């Protein structure tokens, strides 16, 4: 057999996309390629895996964002090596929206970790047999020491590598403590002790990693479930109507996806055929199934409990609602909570102190084993795990409830909020108003015309009032005249050009600002309607008032209860803001028991209210759902967007997004944030106590290096186990 090892060879030199690839090795059907642009970029790693997997003869491909390398297993006879390199290079330019929302395959592959544990365990077993079965002396001979040293270096490689990296950066980390103890034991010919310690530490690291991956796996299952394929119904050609099975990642927008009993819906889209009972808990957090018929919108991750649906795909992969959740969760797990700096400061100061204490112990006692023990027990690994494990578990818990938390810092703030600012429409109210009155204010206009032209102004708006007007025309089967152009006047209304006319639709303030006269009769109607908590919209055509439409939005049934519980849980200030008239705002505020409210506010006014509360020393939460809430959502200590499928600007700006519109989720956000901080504090207390106690006991000579390693592992595993309780915290 001939093996060809190619070192540091550029993969291409003709100006193509392979010029920045380096083939590190290529032998016996296994090729390793370095692609620096993959390093630290999990999404791009997925793109590489997807592109290479499509090439003929490729068996398995793993892209490693931690190292920037790509490993391809292929059939030498069937696979074109150049095509594989081309596919890797081409993946660099794949649009982000076309990359499936999943983790790289490499995140689940930890063969080397398992191999280290197996080899280390086997070596220890053989040494035990040698010592106790064959009654050989405990000290190893030259050949035995050489083998034991080799195995020790192999099992301790991750720690040695980490120590070198930390020393290059001028910081002595926890890996440096383990490495120093290992090197000392090898110099003193304590090979068995070193191997035992490293084997135990490797087991602990593997168990920690296994526990931490539960969150990512739980979130990924929301999108893919247990299925890798989907059924689609062909719509073109002679086989139209035939159902065929395809890989789930190949489903495209516009495909008609067929979903049967007990199968997760793989796309966001509109139901075009069939009816079913659907469990939407993955998206909304609600366990009660709902009935779905043709015309309804469904989301990926929802499960058909009973029935059959044909769904026309409107979003696939990471562009679906659940895909956005997964993307945000993965980004959020890199966000650092302020409390994390406590552990980092402790570790940064504690590691050098541990070296000093160990050196003093060696000088005073002359016992190298005791000094080694001090280094091992002083490793603040558990302290370093305290915050990220808890944050990761809590974010995963929230995602499974339909609460998208975009980072650890926001989670910590959620538990400290003591002032909340609410936007009224769509937040405290249902946000689905209905048209209650249509009044013509001009002799040449009929109510139906007023409604039709109002709908023309609102036809492309996603504002709840606009949607109510459109629904009303559809219910009355009134045709809507097309418009040529429209302009959104934020907080006031719309200006539209249709049929050669200029239309203004909005509040009386809009008409006054545009010099349109509002009659006494219209003003009386406006006042009367506002006292009934109805919102009047005035329609002016070419500078003349022609009609009035009023709409009413009901208060959410759970709003009063949630506000009461927020006050009971320590929220001292609750403020309601609305662009509506003061009369309407007053009626809603009185119904909900809100003392502080402001009406007719613009986006900058909402921002001002948030900043004023912050200046008074409050930790401010802002809850909203519209474009006009975005500045305040961004400025608040924690911004919460209602409805993940709502306004994209609000969802992108907010720190937390709720997948459904149930205000009870606000209580869950605060509860989860507070619980996460409690768990982090427990972790810190437990891990720091173990470090301190271990140092005292170790200095007295009561601990061996092996016992120190066991205690070190026990504290780390205890921290991870304590944090993992958050994964299932109050999740029913």
Curated annotation (Swiss-Prot):
One of its GO terms (biological process) is copper ion homeostasis. This is Zinc-exporting P-type ATPase. Zn(2+) efflux transporter which is involved in detoxification of zinc during infection. Keywords: ATP-binding, Cell membrane, Ion transport, Magnesium, Membrane, Metal-binding, Nucleotide-binding, Translocase, Transmembrane, Transmembrane helix, Transport, Virulence, Zinc, Zinc transport. The lineage of its organism: Bacteria, Bacillati, Actinomycetota, Actinomycetes, Mycobacteriales. It is an enzyme of class 7 (translocase). Increasing concentrations of Mn(2+) does not affect the growth of the wild-type strain, nor that of the deletion mutant, excluding that M.marinum CtpC is a manganese exporter as M.tuberculosis CtpC. Mg(2+) binds at residues 423, 425, 625. The gene is ctpC. InterPro entries: ATPase_P-typ_cyto_dom_N (IPR023299), ATPase_P-typ_P_site (IPR018303), ATPase_P-typ_TM_dom_sf (IPR023298), ATPase_P-typ_transduc_dom_A_sf (IPR008250), HAD-like_sf (IPR036412), HAD_sf (IPR023214), HMA_dom (IPR006121), P-typ_ATPase_IB (IPR027256). Residues 29-96 form the HMA domain. It comes from Mycobacterium marinum (strain ATCC BAA-535 / M).
């Amino acid at each position: 057999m001939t093996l060809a090892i190619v070192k540091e060879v550029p993969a291409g030199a003709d100006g193509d996309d392979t010029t920045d690839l380096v083939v590190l090795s290529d032998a016996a059907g296994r090729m390793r390629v370095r692609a620096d642009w993959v390093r630290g970029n999990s999404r791009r790693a997925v793109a590489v895996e997807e592109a290479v997997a499509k090439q003929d003869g490729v068996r398995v491909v793993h892209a490693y964002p931690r190292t920037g390398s790509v490993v391809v297993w292929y059939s030498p006879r069937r696979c074109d090596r150049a095509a594989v390199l081309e596919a890797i290079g081409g993946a660099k330019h794949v649009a982000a929206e076309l990359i499936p929302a999943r983790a790289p395959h490499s995140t689940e592959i930890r063969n080397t970790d398992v191999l280290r544990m197996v080899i280390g365990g086997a070596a220890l077993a053989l040494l035990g047999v040698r010592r106790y079965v064959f009654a050989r002396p405990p000290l190893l001979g030259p050949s035995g020491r050489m083998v034991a040293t080799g195995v020790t270096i192999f099992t301790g490689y991750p720690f040695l590598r980490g120590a070198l990296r930390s020393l290059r950066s001028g910081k002595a980390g926890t890996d440096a403590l383990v490495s120093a103890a290992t090197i000392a034991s090898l110099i003193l010919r304590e090979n068995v002790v070193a191997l035992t310690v490293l084997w135990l530490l490797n087991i602990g690291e593997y168990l920690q990693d296994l526990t931490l991956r539960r969150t990512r796996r739980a979130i990924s299952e929301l999108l893919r479930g247990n299925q890798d394929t989907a059924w689609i119904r062909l719509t073109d050609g002679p086989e139209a109507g035939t159902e065929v099975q395809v890989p789930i990642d190949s489903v495209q927008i516009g495909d008609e996806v067929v979903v049967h009993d007990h199968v997760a819906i793989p796309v966001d889209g509109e139901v075009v055929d069939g009816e079913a009972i659907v469990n939407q808990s993955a998206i909304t957090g609600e366990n009660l199934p709902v009935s779905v018929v043709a015309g309804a919108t469904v989301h990926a991750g929802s499960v058909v409990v009973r029935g059959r649906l044909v769904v026309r795909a409107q979003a696939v992969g990471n562009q679906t609602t659940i895909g956005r959740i997964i993307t945000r969760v993965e980004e959020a797990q890199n966000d650092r909570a302020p409390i994390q700096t406590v552990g980092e400061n402790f570790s940064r100061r504690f590691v050098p102190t541990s070296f000093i204490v160990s050196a003093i112990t060696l000088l005073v006692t002359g016992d190298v084993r005791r000094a080694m023990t001090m280094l091992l027990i002083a490793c603040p690994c558990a302290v370093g795990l305290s915050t990220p494990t808890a944050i990761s578990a809590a974010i995963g818990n929230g995602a499974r409830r339909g609460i998208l938390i975009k980072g650890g810092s926001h989670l910590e703030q959620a538990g400290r909020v003591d002032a909340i600012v609410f936007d009224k429409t769509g937040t405290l109210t249902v946000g689905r108003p209905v048209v209650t009155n249509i009044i013509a204010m001009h002799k040449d206009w009929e109510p139906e015309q007023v409604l039709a032209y109002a709908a023309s102004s609102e036809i492309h708006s996603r504002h709840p009032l606009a949607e109510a007007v459109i629904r009303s025309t559809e219910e009355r089967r009134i045709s809507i005249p097309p418009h040529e152009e429209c302009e959104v006047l934020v907080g006031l209304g719309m200006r539209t050009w249709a049929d050669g006319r200029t239309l203004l639709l909005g509040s009386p303030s809009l008409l006054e600002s545009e010099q349109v006269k509002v009659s006494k009769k219209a003003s009386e109607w406006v006042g009367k309607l506002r006292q009934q908590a109805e919102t009047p919209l005035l329609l002016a055509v070419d500078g003349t008032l022609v009609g009035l439409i009023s709409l009413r939005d009901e208060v959410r049934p759970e709003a009063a209860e949630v506000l009461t519980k927020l006050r009971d849980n320590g929220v001292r200030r609750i403020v309601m803001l609305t662009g509506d008239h003061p009369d309407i705002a007053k009626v809603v505020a009185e119904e909900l028991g809100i003392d502080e409210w402001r009406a007719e506010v613009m986006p900058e006014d909402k921002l001002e209210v948030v900043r004023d509360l912050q200046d008074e020393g409050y930790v401010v939460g802002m809850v909203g759902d519209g474009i006009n809430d975005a500045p305040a959502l961004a400025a608040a200590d924690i911004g919460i967007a209602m409805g993940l499928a709502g306004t994209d600007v609000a969802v992108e700006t907010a720190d937390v997004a709720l997948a459904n519109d149930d205000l009870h989720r606000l209580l869950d956000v605060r509860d989860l944030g507070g619980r996460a901080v409690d768990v982090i504090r427990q972790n810190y207390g437990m891990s720091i106590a173990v470090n301190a106690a271990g140092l005292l006991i170790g200095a007295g000579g009561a601990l061996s290096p092996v016992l120190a390693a066991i205690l070190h592992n026990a504290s780390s595993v205890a921290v991870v186990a304590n944090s993992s309780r958050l994964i299932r915290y109050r999740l029913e």
